[in-house]
C-alpha cells in the first residue's frame, strides 16, 4: 500500500520506545498445542464461546511469590479463539488466559437479529472482561491484561478507552486502525460492502469456496512466510473451517463484521479510534510484522506515537498474525512490558 493510503492518519511527533524483550524462561513448544478447552458464556443478548488457559507458573517450578495475573485474548476478522493457542501457552508462566470467540465467529452464536457491529463486539468483550475479573482466586476484582489482533485489536483499544477500570495493560497486534484516502481499487471493493444487498451477494460467493481454498488464501494473506506454517496447523485450520461451513451464519458474520469495521472508520470527533488511542491511560504494547499485507506496517510507529504510554515492537519477516507466526518473540515483548510495570 502506498503512503497515500495513510496520509490522513496522525503523524508521529516523537518515536515510542522499543519494547524490551523479556529473558524469562519460556516453555519449549516441542509439539503443537491442541486448542485450550472452553465453554459458552452468557453475554448481552446471547452467548459467546470462551477458552481458558490455566496458569502454569515459572518453568523452573518455583511458584512461591510468582506473579499470577489474568489476560483476555481477542481474535481478528475471520479468526477465532484458537488463534491464541500457542501464545497463551507461553504466557501461562505469568498469565491465566481467556480467549473469546467474538459473536458469530468460532463457536459463538451470532448476535441478536444478526446485527454485527464494532459496538456489539465491544459490548461482548466488556461482558467477558467482567466475567474474568469476577472469577475467584488470585486476581479477583483486578483489571485484566487485554490483547487483540486486527479487528480484535481495534475492539480492544475501544474497550480500554471506554472502560479503563477493566484493563490493566493493552497489547495491540496489527490492530485494524482507521485509514483514509484508500487507493481506488481497494476502496471500491470495500466500500461496496456498505451498499444494500452487496454483503448478501458476497456471502453467496463465499459459500462456494472450499475450506481448503479458504485456508490457503488466509495463509497467503496473513503470514509473512507461508512456509513457516506447520502442516498440522494447516490441517487444524481446515478442520475448523469445515466446522464453520456448517454454521448458517458464518459467511454473514465475516461480511457484516467487515461492513461494521468500515462503517466505524467514518466516525469523527471523540468517537474516532485515533482520538480514543490518544486518550488511553494503560501501558500499551504495539506489535507489528513488517510483512503485514492487510494493515500497513507504516501505521505501527504512528499508533505508538499517539498512545501516551506505549512501546513498539516491529518483527522482521512477520505478517499480520504475529501471535501465530512468531509466538515466542511476541510473548517476550508482552512479558517485557509487564516486567517493567511499577511493583512487578
Each predicted region: which residue ranges?
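Conserved alpha/beta-hydrolase catalytic His-Asp/Glu region
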Residues: 206-276
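Acidic catalytic loop of the alpha/beta-hydrolase fold
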Residues: 267, 291-295
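Flexible "cap/lid" loop of the alpha/beta hydrolase fold
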Residues: 169-204
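Short beta-strand/loop motif that positions the catalytic acidic residue
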Residues: 280, 286-288
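Conserved acidic catalytic loop of the alpha/beta-hydrolase fold
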Residues: 120-142
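Catalytic active-site module of serine/aspartate enzymes centered on a nucleophile-bearing elbow/loop
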Residues: 308-344
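Conserved HGGG/HGGXW glycine-rich cap/lid loop of the alpha/beta-hydrolase fold
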Residues: 46-110, 324
Amino acid at each position: 500500500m502506498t503512503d497515500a493510503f495513510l496520509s490522513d492518519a496522525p503523524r508521529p511527533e516523537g518515536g515510542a520506545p522499543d519494547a524490551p524483550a523479556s529473558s524469562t524462561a519460556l516453555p519449549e513448544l516441542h509439539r503443537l498445542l491442541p486448542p485450550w478447552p472452553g465453554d459458552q458464556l452468557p453475554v448481552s443478548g446471547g452467548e459467546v464461546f470462551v477458552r481458558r488457559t490455566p496458569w502454569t507458573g515459572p518453568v523452573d517450578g518455583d511458584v512461591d511469590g510468582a506473579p499470577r495475573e489474568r489476560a483476555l485474548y481477542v481474535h481478528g476478522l475471520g479468526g477465532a479463539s484458537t488463534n491464541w493457542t500457542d501464545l497463551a501457552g507461553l504466557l501461562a508462566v505469568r498469565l491465566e488466559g481467556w480467549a473469546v470467540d467474538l459473536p458469530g465467529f468460532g463457536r459463538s452464536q451470532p448476535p441478536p437479529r444478526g446485527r454485527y457491529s464494532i459496538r456489539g463486539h465491544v459490548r461482548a468483550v466488556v461482558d467477558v472482561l467482567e466475567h474474568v475479573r469476577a472469577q475467584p482466586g488470585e486476581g479477583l476484582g483486578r483489571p485484566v491484561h487485554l490483547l487483540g489482533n486486527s479487528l480484535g485489536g481495534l475492539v480492544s483499544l475501544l474497550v480500554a478507552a471506554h472502560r479503563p477500570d477493566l484493563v490493566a495493560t493493552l497489547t495491540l497486534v496489527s490492530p485494524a486502525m482507521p485509514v483514509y484516502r484508500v487507493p481506488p481499487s481497494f476502496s471500491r471493493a470495500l466500500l461496496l460492502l456498505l451498499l444494500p444487498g452487496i454483503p448478501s451477494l458476497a456471502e453467496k460467493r463465499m459459500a462456494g469456496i472450499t475450506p481448503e481454498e479458504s485456508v490457503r488464501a488466509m495463509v497467503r494473506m496473513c503470514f509473512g512466510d507461508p512456509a513457516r506454517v506447520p502442516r498440522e496447523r494447516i490441517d487444524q485450520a481446515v478442520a475448523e473451517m469445515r466446522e464453520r461451513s456448517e454454521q448458517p451464519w458464518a459467511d454473514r458474520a465475516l461480511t457484516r463484521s467487515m461492513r461494521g469495521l468500515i462503517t466505524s472508520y467514518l466516525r469523527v470527533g471523540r468517537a474516532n479510534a485515533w482520538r480514543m488511542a490518544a486518550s488511553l491511560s494503560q501501558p500499551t504494547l504495539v506489535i507489528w510484522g513488517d510483512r503485514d499485507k492487510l494493515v500497513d506496517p507504516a501505521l505501527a510507529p504512528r499508533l505508538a506515537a499517539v498512545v501516551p504510554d506505549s512501546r513498539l515492537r516491529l518483527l522482521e519477516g512477520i505478517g499480520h498474525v504475529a501471535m501465530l507466526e512468531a509466538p515466542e518473540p511476541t510473548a517476550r515483548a508482552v512479558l517485557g512490558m509487564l516486567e517493567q510495570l511499577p511493583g512487578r
